[in-house]
């Protein structure tokens, strides 16, 4: 806490009181923002944890299917079957405003109207395990997109929470105490000046009265 270097005048006192009101209002708004950001951040962390578990399980399942398919199919046949994908996806990136933080939103646009039309090969020379691998990856793909959204959102919200926390602390521990200390000092100085002025006026009054009595 430090007193600001300002002149102890009534005008400065009025300015500082207005700044103190604004600082307190800003402090409350920033605390509310920080608390809401923390609430949304914790919800996203919970969702991120669950999504990661589901995605990792699905990828492990797809890897198991692919390992079996690779063991029963010739390498050339397997590579040919997967060479030309049946389904193509284009990601559209939008943004969502969360407490002045712009969170990316990934919207998949599929080439065909049927999202389940994923197999680009016939079944005569391929293993059913290959179907399982492709199906598992196709099923988990939307979750992978959502996981990317959530992880980026967590990163952006964490950065904003830290910025907001620093601003709250600066107001709470530096600016507001400095304003309060300076207002207290100026108020005290003005009171001292007022008492000094009153004392001087009383002395002048006494002198005038004494002089008036001496002329009688």
Say what each PLM segment does.
Residues 1-216:
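Charge-rich amphipathic alpha-helical interaction elements
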């Amino acid at each position: 806490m430090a007193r600001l270097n300002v002149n102890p005048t009534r005008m400065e006192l009025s300015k500082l009181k207005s700044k103190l009101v604004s600082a307190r209002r800003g402090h409350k708004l920033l605390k509310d923002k920080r608390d809401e950001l923390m609430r949304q951040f914790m919800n996203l962390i919970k969702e991120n944890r669950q999504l990661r578990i589901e995605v990792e399980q699905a990828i492990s399942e797809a890897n198991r299917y692919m390992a079996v398919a690779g063991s029963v199919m010739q390498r050339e046949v397997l590579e040919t079957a997967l060479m030309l994908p049946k389904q193509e996806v284009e990601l559209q990136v939008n943004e969502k405003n969360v407490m002045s933080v712009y969170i990316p939103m990934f919207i998949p646009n599929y080439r065909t109207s049927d999202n389940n039309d994923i197999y680009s090969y016939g079944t005569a020379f391929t293993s059913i395990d290959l179907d399982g691998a492709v199906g598992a990856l196709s099923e988990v793909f939307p979750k992978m997109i959502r996981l990317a959204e959530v992880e980026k959102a967590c990163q952006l919200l964490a950065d904003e929470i830290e910025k907001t926390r620093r601003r709250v602390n600066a107001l709470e521990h530096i600016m507001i105490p400095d304003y309060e200390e300076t207002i207290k000092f100026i108020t005290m100085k003005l009171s001292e000046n007022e008492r000094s002025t009153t004392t001087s006026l009383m002395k002048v009054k006494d002198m005038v009265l004494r002089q008036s009595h001496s002329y009688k």
